[in-house]
């Protein structure tokens, strides 16, 4: 039905006359019109969502609508949104925010996200939800604007901190909330001290290593919901119990946490194809690796052992990464004794100078040329990132770097370049956090993280809603090195690369390997021979395989 709008040109004159004469103000026709407007705007009942009616250019998915409705109706606006990577937690948070705004329950909003995601959040809220979100930049907008998106690092820094903590917020949203898992950090303390009526914590990995992490997150939403910290430690943490093994704990957590898994959504997900690319060291690279490995025989200090392990991993990445670590040790020798003595460092630097090629980088160039499409490369080390950009350029391949130290504007620029003519984006762990790159479907794990949850976060950058092609993951692993041992454990033995976060929960979180990385470090530190290391790795693999097959109630025993 089309309603014809007729403008009354006499209205301004009549209004001015009424102001002059102080009346008459009563008008039955205008009153009826006003009443009709109020009736239209009125929300008939609290059940059901109104927000979708106000989204003309965007249709949320069913699981996203269910999450928003549950948070609003049953959780009183305090929830951990823990959907697997790529299911649209930002959309769910946007729906909840829109719903509270429509109902008049939220006006003053604070959204804290990693610096690299600030612009992405503002754009999504404005375009999908028609929410006038404002980005906190150089000028202070905390008090002037109602809906502010900022990095948590900016918000917690003086003089911003004092202003933000003085404002009573109706709703606070925290993205990548797993960074708040440690209650002793400044970030945790800052979020805890925020004055807030409603709060949403977004994370695909609510538990990464220890069950205490979920206690800290829940305590931000509802202090005391899981009891006191001492009680929780005695009842669950010290017994090394899993979330699944304790029905009571699971029920309590589920009252504040929603976790959708890919198979729950009913959506047709693109396939994930995983390929291992074996790398053979050149003789000079092998000599450097062996020189580093031999240091284990003469050093027993834990700190020094950790340094050796780091150097081994860096050697599998690039000679540049090894050199930068050794240089840092020498630069800091005035403040503290280096983990490795100066003479040994000099020997290692001589070995570095004898390395004339990077076998892994050569393999990457061949792979990228074979793919002939956009590729994202993940590396653990900034020195390797810089080297790779130079090396790819020497081989006629265009690339851009992406790392945590970049300012927000530069990160957006790098993403735009990659979306355009640039073929390769080289990201570090911090740089790749939270970015959405569905237009790319090839990923090279140049270096492998030892925490499978971090690996899934990487893959989730491209294997997510909106991906229209099958995803291809290439894992680089140098033969006969610590890198190969880790890859065999994670991939060939327990097939973690084919899993997604929910399945990783079943294998890692629920089976009581409370800190996966610590277990790996312990094996590699204290293995006297290659054979001993293989035996320990096989034992860990058998333990994982056995535990994941047990019913939930028996996994904690």
Curated annotation (Swiss-Prot):
GO molecular function: ATP binding; chromatin binding; DNA binding; helicase activity; hydrolase activity; nucleosome array spacer activity
Single biological process term from Gene Ontology: positive regulation of transcription by RNA polymerase II
Alphabetical list of InterPro entries matching this protein: Helicase_ATP-bd (IPR014001), Helicase_C-like (IPR001650), P-loop_NTPase (IPR027417), SNF2-like_sf (IPR038718), SNF2/RAD54-like_C (IPR049730), SNF2_N (IPR000330)
Keywords annotated in UniProt: ATP-binding, Helicase, Hydrolase, Nucleotide-binding
Domain Helicase ATP-binding: 70-224
Helicase C-terminal domain: residues covered: 363-524
EC number, UniProt record: 3.6.4.-
Alphabetical list of PROSITE patterns matching this protein: HELICASE_ATP_BIND_1 (PS51192), HELICASE_CTER (PS51194)
Coiled-coil region(s): none
Pfam families with a match to the protein in the record: Helicase_C (PF00271), SNF2-rel_dom (PF00176)
Family annotation (SMART domains): DEXDc (SM00487), HELICc (SM00490)
Amino-acid positions noted as binding ATP in the UniProt annotation, renumbered to this chain: 82-90
Keyword ATP-binding: yes
Keyword Repeat applies: no
Motif (DEAH box): 175-178
Assigned protein family: Belongs to the SNF2/RAD54 helicase family.
Protein name per UniProt: Uncharacterized ATP-dependent helicase YqhH
UniProt lineage: Bacteria, Bacillati, Bacillota, Bacilli, Bacillales
